[in-house]
């Protein structure tokens, strides 16, 4: 049950959880040195003064520290989660109680989710945002889809391809009825978007290639201090947390199939092996497949692995990588989960519509499917992000890397006039983000002498690597 305040502009599960949320935010601040150093650096300067930021990113305790950093730097912020299960209700309550409009609660319906996304794009006085912090690209998608509809209203009559599209169209119909040029006005006022995750970045590049991108974007995901830390080390800890909270299963001795061996898949595979599992990897990319094999993982196809796995983890960013046919072949009591951004990596709709299986809810975000032969599988978080649906996501320290990049990207977009395109933060800023986190873990940097720097052709203070360097 959600509560909506008559006076304050927010919608959360339970505002009385705010004190609990505030206590956890204070703990997280101590583990997020990058964000706290950024606050200190810009103290009194308000580099985001006048910015209206719409945030569509998991409403967690760590995100609360990001939100309050943006506010402290002068921004007017509205926030929603980018996933129906990822909100931590005490975090949302604490931010709402602090006066920031937030629209998020754990367990939203798809209709509620897109309603929440619409709310963050509507600022006081009928204004739209001029900046977006996005994770997965849904806020950006809503503006672009709405813009297309205003150019071709017949799109409102199209048959939705799925429940998600139906919910989005419902919101866009309501907006169109109120103002049939709303999204043109919003797009015209946009300075840009900073995108957090691989899936959202993929969407941005696709729009750019088609000539459809309406405003500049900064690809935060491919900053080294995001992709090689959040995606790798974050997943290495939070995947196991999600699986264990959901099932209490012993991982040691199990066969775990990890689908995809990008940065996220690498973190997952190493995590499961560290618990004593035998890990099998599936891959389409020969380079990633060779990396997995050289790390000692068995690399094969899903058609082979499906017969062996006890636990399946999708980490591809693609659709239909675990099909209904795969699920029907799995061993009894197999656990199936996803750690990619969207829920279409596993054919959940096909499973739910399959008459040969009975769905039994065990507890929130854990469902048992019993097949006619007596075998069963357990699906976690309805095929959505298992680490956020069944646990609390990545630890604060690694999220400080990602969110410091997000903050710097927002300042960069606000203070400069970028042409439409997809950009990355410069190497110098990437190195600075890493530098801000070293002291917290007791690491000490060696300093080049002038002669050494000249010898390898880099400045004493960096950057130390060329843009094409692969860490």
From Swiss-Prot:
Its EC number is 3.13.2.1. One of its GO terms (molecular function) is adenosylhomocysteinase activity. InterPro entries: Adenosylhomocyst_ase-like_sf (IPR042172), Adenosylhomocysteinase-like (IPR000043), Ado_hCys_hydrolase_NAD-bd (IPR015878), NAD(P)-bd_dom_sf (IPR036291), S-Ado-L-homoCys_hydrolase_CS (IPR020082). Substrate binds at residues 60, 135, 196, 226, 230. Binds 1 NAD(+) per subunit. Its cofactor is NAD(+). It comes from the Bacteria. This is Adenosylhomocysteinase. NAD(+) binds at residues 197-199, 231, 260-265, 283, 318, 339-341, 387. It is found in: Cytoplasm. SMART domains: AdoHcyase, AdoHcyase_NAD. PANTHER family: ADENOSYLHOMOCYSTEINASE. Pathway: Amino-acid biosynthesis; L-homocysteine biosynthesis; L-homocysteine from S-adenosyl-L-homocysteine: step 1/1. The keyword Cytoplasm applies. It holds the Pfam family AdoHcyase. The keyword NAD applies. It catalyses: S-adenosyl-L-homocysteine + H2O = L-homocysteine + adenosine. May play a key role in the regulation of the intracellular concentration of adenosylhomocysteine. One of its GO terms (biological process) is S-adenosylmethionine cycle. Keywords: Cytoplasm, Hydrolase, NAD, One-carbon metabolism. GO terms for cellular component: cytosol. Belongs to the adenosylhomocysteinase family. It is an enzyme of class 3 (hydrolase). The gene is ahcY.
């Amino acid at each position: 049950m959600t509560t909506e305040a008559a006076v304050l502009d927010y919608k959360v599960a339970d505002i009385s959880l705010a004190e609990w949320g505030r206590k956890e935010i204070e703990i997280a601040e101590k583990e997020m040195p990058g964000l706290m150093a950024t606050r200190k650096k810009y103290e009194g300067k308000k580099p985001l003064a006048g910015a209206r930021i719409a945030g569509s990113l998991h409403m967690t305790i760590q995100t609360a520290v990001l939100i309050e950093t943006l506010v402290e730097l002068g921004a007017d912020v509205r926030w929603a989660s980018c996933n129906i299960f990822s909100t931590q209700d005490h975090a949302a309550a604490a931010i709402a109680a602090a006066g920031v409009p937030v629209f998020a609660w754990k367990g939203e319906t798809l209709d509620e989710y897109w309603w929440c996304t619409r709310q963050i794009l509507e600022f006081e006085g009928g204004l739209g945002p001029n900046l977006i912090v996005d994770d997965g690209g849904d806020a950006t998608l809503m503006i672009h889809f709405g813009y297309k509809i205003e150019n071709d209203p017949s799109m409102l009559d199209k048959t939705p391809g799925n429940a998600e599209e139906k919910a989005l169209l419902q919101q866009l119909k309501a907006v169109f009825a109120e103002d049939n040029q709303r999204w043109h006005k919003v797009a015209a006022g946009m300075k840009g978007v900073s995108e957090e995750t691989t899936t959202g970045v993929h969407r941005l590049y696709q729009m750019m290639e088609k000539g459809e991108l309406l405003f500049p974007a900064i690809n935060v995901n491919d900053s080294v201090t995001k992709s090689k830390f959040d995606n790798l080390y974050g997943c290495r800890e939070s995947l196991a947390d999600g699986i264990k909270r959901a099932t209490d299963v012993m991982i040691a001795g199990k066969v775990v199939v990890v689908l995809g061996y990008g940065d996220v898949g690498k973190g997952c595979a190493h995590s499961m092996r560290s618990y004593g599992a035998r890990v099998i990897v599936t891959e389409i990319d020969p380079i990633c497949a060779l990396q997995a094999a050289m790390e000692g993982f068995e690399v094969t196809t899903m058609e082979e692995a499906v017969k062996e796995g006890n636990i399946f983890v999708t980490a591809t960013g693609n659709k239909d990588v675990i099909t209904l046919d795969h699920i029907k072949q799995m061993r009894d009591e197999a656990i199936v989960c996803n750690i990619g951004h969207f829920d279409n990596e596993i054919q959940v709709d096909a499973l739910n519509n399959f008459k040969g299986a009975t769905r039994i809810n065990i507890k929130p975000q854990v469902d048992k499917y019993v097949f006619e032969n007596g075998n069963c599988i357990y699906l976690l978080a309805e095929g959505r992000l298992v680490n956020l649906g069944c646990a609390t996501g990545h630890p604060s320290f690694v999220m400080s890397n990602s969110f410091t990049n997000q903050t710097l990207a927002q300042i960069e977009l606000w203070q400069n006039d970028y042409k439409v395109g997809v950009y990355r933060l410069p190497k110098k800023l990437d190195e600075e983000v890493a530098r801000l986190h070293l002291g917290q873990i007791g690491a000490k940097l060696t300093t080049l002498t002038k002669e050494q720097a000249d010898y390898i052709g880099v400045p004493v203070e960096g950057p130390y690597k060329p843009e094409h360097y692969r860490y």
